[in-house]
Design a protein with these regions (language model features):
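A general structural signal for short secondary-structure boundary/capping elements
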Residues: 42-43, 61-64, 77-81, 125, ...
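Conserved PLP-enzyme active-site core in the AAT-like
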Residues: 1-78, 82, 95-99, 187-210
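Short, basic, helix/turn surface patches
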Residues: 21-27, 42-49, 126-133, 163-173
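A short linear-motif detector with a strong N-terminal bias
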Residues: 10-13, 89-92, 157-160
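Structural motif
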Residues: 12-14, 31, 110, 135-137, ...
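PLP-dependent enzyme catalytic core of the Aspartate aminotransferase-like
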Residues: 150-210
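Conserved small-domain helix->loop->beta segment predominantly found in fold-type I
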Residues: 61-75, 88-152
Length: 210
């Protein structure tokens, strides 16, 4: 989400996933490596075999999705950023602590909202799931997850499993009960997700509307 990439400020290699921001929500799988030519060659040799490098390799029939995703990524990411800023301002006005706040400079698409209770975190995530294009009928529940000391709740009715550019939210059930909201393939969908999260909070008596 910034004008400069890590390679602009000294990084020799940049690696990442295409089911995140750069894939624009269209890449179903894949990753990328960018950087110094000699290091890219070494990476390619490691991936396939010395001497062959990136001259060979399966494309799996998804190159069109890769290129279209890269083309649309700036627009998709802009919508996700707009959704995060909307979430920050809306929940700030309701009295919740948000990180970053509605006016701070942003370095990614993630928006944290501290919901102050397990009930609040669960209601928020239920609202995000209810706004999903896939599995909107599913009710997310906290569960024990490897690597966490506390139960974690996740909402992600996405077309691509694990995509973080699609609408999602998650958080561990411990103080300050923060939900980490991100994504939305369009600004309108991100906005709908936040409104649905507020609806669930309202239904649980956690926020009031004057």
């Amino acid at each position: 989400v910034e004008e400069k990439e890590p390679s602009d400020v000294g990084a020799d290699l940049v690696v990442g996933s295409l089911i995140k921001n750069p894939g624009g929500g269209l890449a179903p799988i894949g990753g990328y490596v960018a950087g110094r030519k000699d290091l890219i060659e070494q990476c390619a040799y490691r991936l396939t075999s010395p001497g062959l490098g990136k001259e060979v390799g399966a494309s799996l029939g998804v190159m069109q999705s890769f290129y279209q995703g890269l083309f649309l990524a700036p627009t998709v990411v802009a919508g996700a950023l707009k959704g995060a800023i909307f979430a920050a301002n809306a929940y700030e006005k309701l009295g919740f602590k948000v990180v970053p706040d509605g006016k701070e400079e942003r370095y990614d698409i993630i928006q944290a909202v501290e919901l102050r209770s397990a009930k609040g975190l669960i209601a928020f995530c239920k609202g995000i799931q209810a706004a999903a294009p896939v599995d909107s009928f599913v009710t997310p529940e906290p569960w024990a997850m490897p690597g966490y000391d506390d139960d974690v709740i996740m909402a992600a009715g996405a077309f691509v499993q694990g995509s973080s550019i699609e609408l999602s939210a998650d958080g561990p059930l411990r103080e300050p009960y923060a939900a980490y909201f991100q994504g939305g393939l369009t600004w309108y969908h991100a906005k709908l997700g936040i409104i649905m999260s507020m609806q669930k909070m309202y239904e649980e008596g956690l926020i009031t509307v004057e």
